[in-house]
Amino acid sequence: MKMKQLILTLCASLALISFSGIAKDIKIGMAIDDLRLERWQKDRDIFVSKAESLGAKVFVQSANGNEETQMSQIENMINRGVDVLVIIPYNGQVLSNVVAEAKREGIKVLAYDRMINNADIDFYISFDNEKVGEIQAQSLVEKVPQGNYFLMGGSPVDNNARLFRDGQMKVLKPFIDSGKIKVVGDQWVDGWLPENALKIMENALTANNNKIDAVVASNDATAGGAIQALSAQGLAGKVAISGQDADLAGIKRIMAGTQTMTVYKPITQLANTAAEVAVELGNDKQPKSDATLNNGLKEVPARLLTPIKVDKSNIESTVIKDGFHKKSDL
């Protein structure tokens, strides 16, 4: 009888040890480009809520648009012993060394919404960013099939900005080649900052004697800066302009008629899925992918979500219906 009791106790102890090994607390370090932007605040809140509901602990830091700060913050998270790094890079070209450091410590790395190039990352989640650019340009050529176009790219160190441009040019090139569209300027907006976009647009208007018919702006923040410059010349609402992110200010401008459209990327879906992927990585599981993208070093397994065009006609059926914005806020 004593032997039987001893065996049962031993089995229970082994089961407890086994269970403890499986149910480890996942620690996630979330390194964000710039929380001064409304867009990333939403991502953070949704991601943290979902990850915590899955039993993970999340440490968040914002680099405020500074690559050296971000590298230092990532190193700090490595030293804190996180299991997974979720990185929204300010500059996806400069993180290969710090990612290598993380990998040496056995830390998994998820690139969130922006690719990290030439680095041994484990997974990438984003939207189809070339498609974003196509949607932007297609919306403008439908409204302004010929005339003077100004191309306003995003941050020159953001890989996504290049992908947006690739998509835009797929649509614009035939119009440019036929002479229907003339590109009268092409500049990139450092840090995606509205104040930089404002200065660029002011200079573009001066250089072209205000003769600009459409502005291919790559997100709502830069569109907002450009529209400030257009407004000062009495051109707001007369010049077609694209956007992206469905920021509250951007949606309000669309309703007012000063911005033509935006691209809504259902952030709830992105952030929730990213949290699930991060926890899977932390548990040494391989998340399901629907694509692979080459980052210069390797083929990175990825999940790419579908972006949605939003203009005055479908605000209610998209961003309001999804709860991304409240109707009362508009």
Pin down the residues of each PLM region:
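Bacterial N-terminal signal peptides
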Residues: T9-S18
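A residue-level marker of the well-folded mature domains of exported/periplasmic proteins
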Residues: A23-L330
